[in-house]
Design a protein with these regions (language model features):
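Polybasic, low-complexity Lys/Arg-rich tracts in intrinsically disordered regions
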Residues: 2-570, 576-596, 608-610, 616, ...
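Hydrophobic beta-strand segments within extracellular beta-sandwich modules
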Residues: 602-603, 607
Length: 633
């Protein structure tokens, strides 16, 4: 048999129903990501080998069959939270569908333990193992653990995008409120900077302060701008540099805390066909400084922080209605723009709504043009924001181009009057427009899961808006542990309505071992195997890593089939050494001696490998011999 997988190799897994990943680091295949971008919601999604919601691995490559499998979790209307009663069932569909009735009972395997227990189940007849362990949310269900976070660039030598690292203490740049910093309740400024604000989700161990170097965080942990009365009696809004405002901070519902986080990819791209229609939010907290270009009758209607920018909506080239060449929709006249990229929930297979911010007072840092184009400046000129920093300079935070990612909350809240999957920003616009009520605004931000800070790396420049802004596509991956649960990509009421369900909307997966199955040693296979035969090291310069002593000379002829004959000749055609191999080892050691056990001379040798009934392979090898070491005599 010829193996097509290694021990520990994973398999591509397709999710049909349900959601959850345990502690798995999910990664979609290219085809699944394109399906989501084309259709907003994918009915099925496929994950790359080793990055699926279930850990399925090869443990015996020779035994892996060419088969199609189905994996069901709790194949009835069971409560997956009560994991002690939930089991999984793996079915070899290929074996089940053959004509041998004796295979029917062999084709189905039920887990020997419930998913409440961490167990790697060995399926030795199929050369596989399955690990499926239900995740239990800590802190009475209010917390989940981060699994992985990364940022990658198509051109890794040009990391143009960075963020604003979180700082500690009473500083405007302490924008992630994790830890145990507790301010005095009677000092307003300390209340604003309090990590332990009443009602907020707790992250006392600060595990979420380190996401990508403290540049991304859960929305429920970010800092907020609030009114503070100074000793002079003046009331000011502090801190100015913050992603949200008092009243919209923290966990706004049972679904918006840390345990409600989702697994997302945020992609920045110059491909305008993939850009996201979204609101542009005003980030200037001083009402009188915010830009007002809404073309009204002259009354002062300057926007409050975290509301729609008072600026005409722009198209993908930054033009607005009335300007030559404008190509934008006409039904969202104010405050809408385009984020140069997209966000995907890799756990549910949905494209997500987004928003980004701008501080319209910071025009020099691109804060007033309705484009996501952060500057490289954390600090500005001489002045100084609350908390100081930067040698007394004011904090500009790149123009405050915060990135907001919103999950589809319709399913978990059980109503269609909640944030949907990507709808070109329609839900966000309807609920955030100037006349939007406080209830509507809270409804929006209770669906916000992740916030990213934005800063252009020193020494880099963005492209022009006409060329797509992004100089080098970047991908941010944010992964957390999620419990397995019911889910339907098309049915909001999946808890009670099973129409169209195969497994009661509980997790249901399929995978194939066709590409990794062991195959018989057919002639065509072995012929290709001949191409892999090699000799190492080549050339040999007096030493090799395979030698065990000063008197040892050794090279290896590698990637050999089980049965073959190896003949080694000098350039005069004289046979120097012959090996007859008939064992499962894949290499033969040559001690650089002839048949009479005499060390060979340096030079070029011809190595001929003959595989009976298949073919042969000829290699040239060059070696330089070292003098015999007589120190040991």
């Amino acid at each position: 048999m010829v193996q097509n997988a290694e021990y520990g190799s994973g398999v591509e897994i397709t999710r049909l129903e349900g959601k959850g990943n345990g502690r798995g680091d999910l990664e979609l295949t290219y085809a699944s990501e394109q399906d989501i971008l084309d259709n907003t919601i994918a009915s099925t999604v496929t994950y790359t080998a080793g990055h699926g919601p279930v850990d399925i691995r090869v443990v015996d490559p020779i035994r892996v069959p060419d088969a199609e499998f189905e994996l069901r979790l709790a194949g009835d209307d069971a409560d997956l939270e009560d994991a002690i009663d939930a089991y999984w069932t793996l079915t070899n569909e290929t074996m089940l569908s053959d004509d041998d009735p004796d295979n029917d009972y062999k084709a189905v395997h039920e887990s020997s333990t419930s998913i409440a227990l961490l167990n790697e189940e060995l399926l030795l007849d199929w050369g596989l193992s399955v690990t499926l362990h239900q995740y239990a949310y800590p802190e009475d269900g209010k917390f989940t653990e981060p699994v992985h976070a990364s940022i990658t660039f198509d051109d890794s030598s040009k990391p143009w995008f960075v963020g604003i690292p979180d700082q500690e203490g009473f500083s405007e740049l302490n924008w992630i409120r994790a830890g145990n910093q507790e301010g005095a309740d009677d000092v307003p400024s300390e209340v604003i900077f309090n990590d332990l604000k009443t009602g907020n989700p707790l992250d006392e161990d600060e595990v979420y302060e380190g996401i990508l170097g403290g540049t991304w965080a859960p929305y429920c942990l970010v800092s907020y701008t609030g009114d503070v009365e100074l000793p002079t009696g003046e009331v000011v809004s502090l801190p100015n540099i913050a992603p949200t405002v008092d009243g919209l901070e923290g966990d706004l519902s049972p679904f918006s805390g840390i345990s409600g986080l989702n697994n997302v990819d945020v992609v920045l791209t110059s491909n305008k066909d993939l850009w996201t229609r979204c609101p542009v939010l005003e980030m200037q907290s001083v009402h009188e400084l915010a830009q007002d270009e809404d073309g009204d009758d002259g009354t002062n209607t300057r926007p409050e922080k975290l509301t729609l920018r008072h600026h005409p909506s722009v198209d993908k080239n930054g033009r607005y209605a009335g300007q030559s060449g404008y190509e934008g929709p006409g039904n969202q006249p104010m405050g809408m723009g385009w984020f140069p990229g997209y966000a995907i929930d890799v756990g549910t297979g949905e494209r997500l709504n987004m928003a980004f911010g701008e501080d319209s007072w910071l025009g020099a840092d691109n804060g007033d043009d309705m484009l996501w184009n952060p500057s490289p400046n954390i600090y500005g000129g001489v002045g100084g924001g609350f908390g100081g920093g930067g040698g007394g300079s004011a904090i500009y935070a790149g123009g405050q181009h915060w990135i907001y990612v919103f999950k589809n909350s319709q399913y978990e809240e059980g109503t269609e009057n909640r944030m949907p999957a990507y709808d070109e920003g329609a839900y966000l616009y309807e609920n955030l427009e100037v006349s939007g009520s406080t209830t509507n605004v809270r409804r929006v931000f209770r669906a916000c899961t992740w916030v990213g800070s934005s800063l252009l790396n020193d020494g880099f420049e963005l492209l022009s808006i006409e060329d797509g802004l992004i100089p080098n596509d970047a991908r941010i991956r944010l992964r957390v542990a999620k419990a397995y649960e019911k889910y339907s990509p098309t049915n909001v009421d999946a808890e009670d309505n099973y129409d169209g369900a195969t497994n009661f909307w509980n997790p249901l997966y399929t995978f194939s071992t066709k590409d990794i199955a062991a195959v018989p040693m057919q002639d065509t296979v072995l012929t290709s195997v001949l191409d892999e035969i090699n000799v190492v090291p080549n050339p040999y310069y007096a030493f090799s890593q395979y030698e065990t002593s000063k008197l040892d000379n050794r090279i290896k002829i590698t990637n050999l089939p089980e049965v073959c004959t190896i003949r080694i000749y000098n350039l005069q055609g004289t046979l120097v050494r012959q090996f007859s191999k008939a064992d499962p080892l894949t290499s033969v050691d040559w001690d650089l001696k002839n048949e009479r056990n005499v060390p060979i001379a340096g030079g070029v040798y011809i190595i001929h490998v003959e595989v009976p009934g298949i073919g042969d392979k000829t290699l040239k090898w060059f070696g330089i011999m070292r003098p015999t070491d007589l120190d040991n005599f």
